[in-house]
């Protein structure tokens, strides 16, 4: 079943593999499956944490999207990635999918830096919210029932709003907003438009992160 789901979705499979390997490396260092961040160099060096965003620390805005806090966090996100990501990748194409996914990670990080600067954050869920928004556009393009993707987004947003302090509110909302902005052009019939959408979203996210973390704009805590 898993092989069939990931057929023609190499990027989805690769992202899931990278997330799993990062988790295993952090778990081995921390000697734990339930808290792999602060007792491992892998976790401590890749988690998004605003005060550490400087120089090489900028990579945290990307690497944090491949780090998960515990085994349950990893399993839930990889389950969503495999089934939602594979569907989106098969529709939009592998190249545009990769650009859009990375843009989703960065826009989620952007939102966290803007609204919750000093909150340590990790996980693929911001990018998954991006993909869920795109999934709605795919259903519309196919003229299929919109209820399933709308319910999926609605349930996840409700869970986010009802779970303060346990999930990244701003990461999720930032990823969802990015997906909403990309969804229509990313599902265009034009492959050139799909590539351009992912590329522009990625570049804009990078520029916004840079602007947010300039010395004159970094929040003082």
Which residues are covered by each model-predicted region?
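Hydrophobic transmembrane alpha-helices
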Residues: 85, 133-138, 178-187
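C-terminal transmembrane module of polytopic alpha-helical membrane proteins
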Residues: 1-7, 162-221
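Alpha-helical transmembrane bundle and helix-membrane interface signal
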Residues: 90-91, 135-150, 187-199
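Alpha-helical transmembrane segments of multi-pass membrane proteins
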Residues: 18-26, 78, 126-134, 152-161, 176-180, 204-210
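N-terminal TM1-TM2 helical hairpin plus the immediately adjacent luminal interfacial "cap"
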Residues: 8-122, 164-167
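Hydrophobic alpha-helical transmembrane segments
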Residues: 12-17, 75, 98-102, 128, ...
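Membrane-interface micro-motifs in multi-pass membrane enzymes
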Residues: 117-134, 168-171
């Amino acid at each position: 079943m898993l092989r069939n789901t990931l057929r023609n979705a190499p990027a989805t499979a690769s992202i899931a593999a990278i997330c799993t390997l990062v988790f295993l490396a952090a778990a081995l260092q921390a000697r734990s499956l339930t808290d792999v961040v602060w007792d491992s160099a892998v976790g401590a060096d890749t988690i998004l944490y605003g005060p550490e965003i400087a120089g090489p620390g900028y990579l945290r805005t990307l690497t944090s999207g491949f780090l998960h806090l515990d085994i349950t966090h990893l399993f839930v996100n990889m389950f969503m990635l495999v089934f939602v990501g594979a569907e989106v990748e098969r529709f939009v194409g592998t190249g545009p999918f990769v650009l859009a996914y990375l843009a989703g990670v960065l826009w989620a990080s952007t939102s966290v830096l803007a609204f919750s600067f000093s909150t340590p954050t990790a996980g693929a869920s911001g990018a998954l919210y991006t993909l869920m928004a795109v999934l709605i556009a795919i259903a519309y393009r196919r003229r299929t029932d919109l209820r399933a993707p709308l319910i999926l987004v609605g349930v996840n947003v409700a869970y986010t709003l009802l779970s303060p302090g346990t999930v990244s509110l701003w990461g999720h909302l930032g990823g969802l907003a990015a997906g909403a902005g990309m969804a229509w052009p990313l599902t265009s019939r034009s492959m050139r438009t799909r590539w351009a959408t992912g590329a522009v979203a990625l570049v804009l996210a990078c520029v916004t992160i840079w602007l947010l973390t300039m010395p004159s704009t970094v929040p003082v805590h």
